[in-house]
Curated annotation (Swiss-Prot):
This is Probable sulfurtransferase. Its EC number is 2.8.1.-. ATP binds at residues 83, 179, 206. Pfam families: ATP_bind_3 (PF01171). GO terms for biological process: tRNA wobble position uridine thiolation. Belongs to the TtcA family. [4Fe-4S] cluster binds at residues 172, 175, 284. Keywords: 4Fe-4S, ATP-binding, Iron, Iron-sulfur, Metal-binding, Nucleotide-binding, Transferase. PANTHER family: ATPASES OF THE PP SUPERFAMILY-RELATED (PTHR11807), CYTOPLASMIC TRNA 2-THIOLATION PROTEIN 1 (PTHR11807:SF12).
Length: 337
């Protein structure tokens, strides 16, 4: 493990297109990094660590980079708090954002939230999964914070369901509330301590194309309002009422740079780069892969359709976006037919 001297590295490649770890260097864009096999060999010889080129990692990195630029998700000197569960999505996101420390001069902070899921704590500090998370943060030279909350998200959602008329709240809802409460509070504290506008501190989530298309289809199947994830969302201050107490949600900005990326490409990129991720969903009894939820069925339906229509997930998201755009311009549904 070594600390990379950027001045020396620049002799061989453009570090704006490399993900730099202490134990390896990943190539985000071979052409833009100006890398040849000879230069890769020289880097390995001088720094004593492997240079890994993965076509999938390059593809994902390029696509995420274009998505960030198109939607202006990240600005120079932003502070980006990555919600790091250690799973495939958030871990790959952390690696992809590493280059923006050099490109845009951003500051990266990785934060893991230790939530209580009916007595199960997948992100407790002494677990093997969290040790793996800490290892990756150390290799990327990114500060890591663990935020703990003892409230049981299963009990919280039972309270909401009991006091709601005809609505059922899953533990996933209260889990997301706890995470946003803690991450939003941290973002506010950082903005105040740094004396910068809250817009300069952003929360980064690893939601991908599968997540977005599954969500859209599940909402349709449940007869709910059409909801989907956006590249950048501004949230106003809000409170979730749990009867005997309220959980405040601070004003914040959430970014989702991984929205155009398929889950299978995320897994393939990590595998090709030799990056082990925490299978945190195996620890949670309410994850998509367990049970018989509508969301799981929607995932399976789209997975099956992908065999015949490879871009079906992009089409689902595109249709939702076009529908919202249409009705925002035509509130009474006029059509020019």
């Amino acid at each position: 493990m070594v600390e990379i001297n950027l001045r020396e590295l620049k002799k061989y490649a453009n570090p704006f297109f490399l993900t730099i770890r202490k134990d390896k260097i990943l190539v985000n864009n071979k052409r833009m990094a100006r890398l040849s096999r000879t230069k890769m060999d020289k880097i390995e010889e001088e720094f004593g660590i492997p240079v890994i080129y993965s076509k999938t990692y390059e593809y994902v990195s390029t696509k995420v980079g274009r998505f960030i630029n198109k939607h202006k998700i990240i600005a120079p000197r932003d502070i980006v708090i990555v919600g790091l569960s250690g799973g495939k999505d958030s871990l790959l996101l952390l690696h992809l954002l590493e280059v923006y420390r050099r490109k845009y001069g951003i500051k990266l902070i990785a934060v893991t939230v230790d939530v209580n899921i009916g007595g199960i704590r997948p992100w407790k500090e002494d677990t093997e999964g969290v040790k793996l998370i800490k290892h990756h943060c150390e290799m990327l030279n990114v500060p890591h914070i663990i935020l703990k909350n003892d409230l049981d998200v299963v009990e919280l959602s039972e309270i909401l369901t009991k006091h709601s008329k005809g609505m059922e709240f899953s533990p996933c809802f209260s889990c997301s509330v706890i995470k946003r409460h803690l991450l939003g509070k941290l973002a506010k504290e950082i903005a105040e301590n740094e004396n910068i506008p809250y817009e300069k501190v952003k929360l980064a989530y690893g939601h991908n194309l599968d997540d977005n298309s599954d969500t859209i289809l599940a909402n349709i199947f449940k007869g709910e309002r059409l909801k989907f994830m956006r590249p950048l969302t501004r949230f106003k201050y809000n409170e979730v009422d749990y009867q005997s107490f309220k959980i405040p949600l601070e004003e914040c900005i959430i970014i989702r740079p991984m929205l155009p990326i398929l889950e299978r490409d995320i897994i393939k990129a990590l595998e090709e780069c030799g990056i082990e991720y925490y299978k945190d969903k195996d620890m949670c009894p309410y994850s998509r892969d367990r049970g018989d939820s509508v969301r799981r069925r929607c995932h399976e339906i789209l997975e099956k359709l992908e065999e015949e229509i490879p871009n079906i997930r992009e089409m689902v998201v595109s249709s939702a976006l076009k529908t919202v755009e249409y009705y925002s311009k035509n509130p009474y549904g006029e059509d020019n037919l």
